[in-house]
A protein has these predicted regions:
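Active-site catalytic loop in hydrolytic enzyme cores
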Residues: 6-62, 75-84, 88, 149-154
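A signal for specific C-terminal beta-sheet/loop modules enriched in small/flexible residues
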Residues: 14-16, 138-143
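Glycine-centered loop/turn positions within well-structured domains
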Residues: 9, 124, 146
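Short, well-ordered beta-strand micro-motif
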Residues: 29-31, 118, 137-139
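A short C-terminal boundary segment appended to hydrolase-like catalytic domains
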Residues: 143-160
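CN hydrolase (nitrilase-like) catalytic-core segments centered on the catalytic cysteine
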Residues: 50-136
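Short loop segments at secondary-structure junctions
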Residues: 33-35, 121-123, 140-143
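Short, well-ordered junction/capping motifs at the entry into regular secondary structure
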Residues: 1-2
Length: 160
């Protein structure tokens, strides 16, 4: 469930998820075991949740290594904010971010941004798909995650 679910007026025009989806009240994580046996703690979010950094900090506090952000940003907001928000969430929470994103012009005329992306905890884009059907794939490296967290231990220095 998205933690935020209200009408967005002119931003999404005819879209009002709040009519059909109830907002959640608790961040959700789960453990995913890779074929290698490595366990990854995954923090869940949906689309507009990306604009609320406190959700991702809650995931980080719960030990998230990977933040999952499936989305359908509009073309306008996606072009302006998508990449910078994803990279910021990765850096400020020292976690990988995987963001599958719907893109293209839809039957109702809605134009979504696309640009599915995998970002590492340093904020580097590891893989990206601009528009159209396709797959974004990349490797999650636990050694890279540990190295970045050791190099920049900001989560242990936080004020609040």
């Amino acid at each position: 469930d998205p933690l935020w679910s209200r009408g967005l007026g002119d931003v999404y025009k005819r879209q009002d998820e709040g009519r059909v989806i109830d907002a959640g009240d608790t961040p959700v994580q789960f453990d995913l075991q890779a074929r290698s046996g490595q366990r990854w703690r995954v923090g869940l979010s949906v689309c507009y949740d990306l604009r609320f950094p406190e959700l991702y900090r809650a995931h980080a506090r719960a030990g998230a290594d990977l933040l999952l952000v499936p989305s359908a940003f509009t073309h306008t907001t996606g072009q302006a904010h998508w990449e910078v928000l994803l990279r910021a969430r990765a850096v400020e929470n020292l976690a990988y971010v995987l963001a599958p994103a719907q893109g293209g012009v839809h039957a109702n005329g809605r134009h979504t941004w696309g640009h599915s992306m995998l970002v590492d905890p340093w904020g580097s884009i590891l893989a990206q798909r601009d528009q159209g059907a396709g797959v974004v794939a990349g490797e999650l490296d636990v050694q890279r995650l540990s190295a970045v967290r050791a190099q920049l231990p900001a989560l242990t220095h936080r004020v609040l």
